[in-house]
Amino acid sequence: MSPTISHKDSSRQRRPGNFSHSLDMKSGPLPPGGWDDSHLDSAGREGDREALLGDTGTGDFLKAPQSFRAELSSILLLLFLYVLQGIPLGLAGSIPLILQSKNVSYTDQAFFSFVFWPFSLKLLWAPLVDAVYVKNFGRRKSWLVPTQYILGLFMIYLSTQVDRLLGNTDDRTPDVIALTVAFFLFEFLAATQDIAVDGWALTMLSRENVGYASTCNSVGQTAGYFLGNVLFLALESADFCNKYLRFQPQPRGIVTLSDFLFFWGTVFLITTTLVALLKKENEVSVVKEETQGITDTYKLLFAIIKMPAVLTFCLLILTAKIGFSAADAVTGLKLVEEGVPKEHLALLAVPMVPLQIILPLIISKYTAGPQPLNTFYKAMPYRLLLGLEYALLVWWTPKVEHQGGFPIYYYIVVLLSYALHQVTVYSMYVSIMAFNAKVSDPLIGGTYMTLLNTVSNLGGNWPSTVALWLVDPLTVKECVGASNQNCRTPDAVELCKKLGGSCVTALDGYYVESIICVFIGFGWWFFLGPKFKKLQDEGSSSWKCKRNN
C-alpha cells in the first residue's frame, strides 16, 4: 500500500509508507493517492527548510521588511509552481495501477519503479543547477523556464502516443520500456524544477516571509499530486464516473490520460511563458551560501560521507527498510490484481490527509529529545507485523468480493489497516528526520541534511524495486488440464493453453516474499537495531565535518 500524498524527505516523491506505487507505500515521503514510501518520499527539502529557519547571515538586512500581503503574489506563484511539479509526480504514481489492471508482470512493474528514483538522486546534479546559469536571465529562471517548457512540450507529444504505449489502440500489451523512459524523464525534469524553485524561494521572499516557502512546497506538491493521481484515476474510470457523476452511462471516463496530458502540457507552456516574461528575480539571497561552487560542493559531500559515524548511518539506513519492501511496494498492486478498483484505492488517500497532518505533530513530541531513534526502534516491529496483516488482507480480498464489488466493511478494514500502518511509518519517518537534524553540522546544515535524507530515501527505493522484481520468480504456477506440462516460462504457458490447459497459481510469490521480508526485518531489528540506536550516543564531534576553506 502506499501513502498518499507525499512527504518530502530528501527526495520528495511519495509519502512514507505505501500500498503500491500509486497507492504508494514506500518508505519516504509518499506521493498522494496511493499506498507507496515512496516515495518520505526532494533533494534537500528538509535541508532547505533547515536553512530557511537557520542563521540567515548579513544578507538579511539588504531587504526591507515586507508584509505578507505585499508578497502575496510571490507566495501564490511559488504555490502554483509546486502544484505544477506535483502533476507529473501524480501521473507517474498512477501508471503502476493502470498497468496492473492490464495484467503486466511484476518484473515489468519493477522496471517501471525506476521512474521514482530521480527525486532520491537529485543531489547528484543539484550543485550543477545552483552553479550554472545565465546571469542576465536569472539564476533560477535559467533552469526553471527551459525545464518547464520541455515538460510541457513532452506532455503534449506524449498525449499523442500514450494510448499506443498503454496498448489501448490495438489490444497489445503495454510498452513498459517506453513508458518507463517517458516517465523517468518526467520525474527527472520535475526534480530539476524542484531544485530551481527551492532555490528561487530563498530570494523571491523577504526574510520575514521566507518561512512560507516550505508551506507552499508541502501544500502545492500535495495538491498537484492529488490532481495528477487521485482526481485523474477517478475521472478516468468509466465505472466511477457512471456511478457518481453521470446520469447516462458511457463506456469511458470523463477524461483520458491523453486528454489529461494535453491539458496540463498546455498549462505548462502558457504559465512558463508568463513567468519568463513577467517575473523578475531578486539578486540578493536571504540565506548564506554554504559552498562556493560545484567542485566545493562535491568535495564537501565526499568529506561528509567518509566520516565513520555518517558512513555507519548510511549503511544501516540503506538496509533498515528491506523488511517493509513487500508490504510497501506490492500490496496495492495485489489488491488491484484481486479486483479492487484502482480509483477506490486512490480515493482512500483522501480521509488519510488529516491523519498525515496530525501524526507528525504528535510524534515530534517523542522525538524532540536527545534520543529520537528510540521511536524508530520501537515502531519497527509493529510495522513489520502490519506487513503480515497486509498479506492477510490480500488473501482475504477475493473471499469477500460479491457480484463484482466489495462491501463497505471491506473498505473500512482496508482504511483502518492503512491508518495503523501510517502511524508506524510516520513514527519512523519523523524519528529519522529529527535525528538527521540533530546530528547535522550547523555550519553546513542544508548540504549535510540533504545528504542524510537522500540516503534515507534510497534505503526505501531500492528494496521496493527488488521486491517487485522477485514476485514473479518466487511464484509457482501449475498447468491444470494438460498432462506433463508446466508454466515456468512464457513459452511453456502458451503451450499449456494450446493443449487445453490453464496455468493456476499454486504459490503466490507475494506471500513468500512477505514472510521472508518480515524475517529479514526482525533480524535487522535484533542484531543491527541496537547498533543503529547507539549512533545517537556518539559525541557531537563525531558528526562535525572538518573541511579546508
From Swiss-Prot:
<dbReference type="GO" id="GO:0055085">
    <property type="term" value="P:transmembrane transport"/>
</dbReference>
<feature type="topological domain" description="Cytoplasmic">
    <location>
        <begin position="365"/>
        <end position="378"/>
    </location>
</feature>
<dbReference type="GO" id="GO:0016020">
    <property type="term" value="C:membrane"/>
</dbReference>
<keyword id="KW-0890">Hereditary spastic paraplegia</keyword>
<comment type="function">
    <text>Acetyl-CoA transporter that mediates active acetyl-CoA import through the endoplasmic reticulum (ER) membrane into the ER lumen where specific ER-based acetyl-CoA:lysine acetyltransferases are responsible for the acetylation of ER-based protein substrates, such as BACE1. Necessary for O-acetylation of gangliosides.</text>
</comment>
<feature type="topological domain" description="Cytoplasmic">
    <location>
        <begin position="135"/>
        <end position="141"/>
    </location>
</feature>
<keyword id="KW-0813">Transport</keyword>
<dbReference type="GO" id="GO:0005789">
    <property type="term" value="C:endoplasmic reticulum membrane"/>
</dbReference>
<feature type="topological domain" description="Extracellular">
    <location>
        <begin position="399"/>
        <end position="404"/>
    </location>
</feature>
<feature type="transmembrane region" description="Helical">
    <location>
        <begin position="257"/>
        <end position="277"/>
    </location>
</feature>
<feature type="topological domain" description="Cytoplasmic">
    <location>
        <begin position="1"/>
        <end position="74"/>
    </location>
</feature>
<feature type="transmembrane region" description="Helical">
    <location>
        <begin position="509"/>
        <end position="529"/>
    </location>
</feature>
<feature type="transmembrane region" description="Helical">
    <location>
        <begin position="218"/>
        <end position="238"/>
    </location>
</feature>
<feature type="transmembrane region" description="Helical">
    <location>
        <begin position="114"/>
        <end position="134"/>
    </location>
</feature>
<keyword id="KW-1133">Transmembrane helix</keyword>
<comment type="subunit">
    <text>Homodimerizes.</text>
</comment>
<feature type="topological domain" description="Extracellular">
    <location>
        <begin position="163"/>
        <end position="175"/>
    </location>
</feature>
<feature type="topological domain" description="Cytoplasmic">
    <location>
        <begin position="197"/>
        <end position="217"/>
    </location>
</feature>
<feature type="topological domain" description="Extracellular">
    <location>
        <begin position="239"/>
        <end position="256"/>
    </location>
</feature>
<dbReference type="GO" id="GO:0008521">
    <property type="term" value="F:acetyl-CoA transmembrane transporter activity"/>
</dbReference>
<feature type="topological domain" description="Extracellular">
    <location>
        <begin position="530"/>
        <end position="549"/>
    </location>
</feature>
<feature type="topological domain" description="Extracellular">
    <location>
        <begin position="321"/>
        <end position="343"/>
    </location>
</feature>
<dbReference type="GO" id="GO:0005886">
    <property type="term" value="C:plasma membrane"/>
</dbReference>
<feature type="transmembrane region" description="Helical">
    <location>
        <begin position="300"/>
        <end position="320"/>
    </location>
</feature>
<keyword id="KW-0256">Endoplasmic reticulum</keyword>
<feature type="transmembrane region" description="Helical">
    <location>
        <begin position="176"/>
        <end position="196"/>
    </location>
</feature>
<feature type="topological domain" description="Extracellular">
    <location>
        <begin position="96"/>
        <end position="113"/>
    </location>
</feature>
<keyword id="KW-0812">Transmembrane</keyword>
<feature type="modified residue" description="Phosphoserine">
    <location>
        <position position="22"/>
    </location>
</feature>
<feature type="compositionally biased region" description="Basic and acidic residues">
    <location>
        <begin position="36"/>
        <end position="46"/>
    </location>
</feature>
<feature type="topological domain" description="Cytoplasmic">
    <location>
        <begin position="278"/>
        <end position="299"/>
    </location>
</feature>
<dbReference type="Pfam" id="PF13000">
    <property type="entry name" value="Acatn"/>
</dbReference>
<feature type="transmembrane region" description="Helical">
    <location>
        <begin position="75"/>
        <end position="95"/>
    </location>
</feature>
<feature type="transmembrane region" description="Helical">
    <location>
        <begin position="142"/>
        <end position="162"/>
    </location>
</feature>
<dbReference type="GO" id="GO:0035348">
    <property type="term" value="P:acetyl-CoA transmembrane transport"/>
</dbReference>
<keyword id="KW-0472">Membrane</keyword>
<keyword id="KW-0209">Deafness</keyword>
<protein>
    <recommendedName>
        <fullName>Acetyl-coenzyme A transporter 1</fullName>
    </recommendedName>
</protein>
<dbReference type="InterPro" id="IPR024371">
    <property type="entry name" value="AcetylCoA_trans_1-like"/>
</dbReference>
<dbReference type="GO" id="GO:0042803">
    <property type="term" value="F:protein homodimerization activity"/>
</dbReference>
<keyword id="KW-0898">Cataract</keyword>
<feature type="topological domain" description="Cytoplasmic">
    <location>
        <begin position="426"/>
        <end position="508"/>
    </location>
</feature>
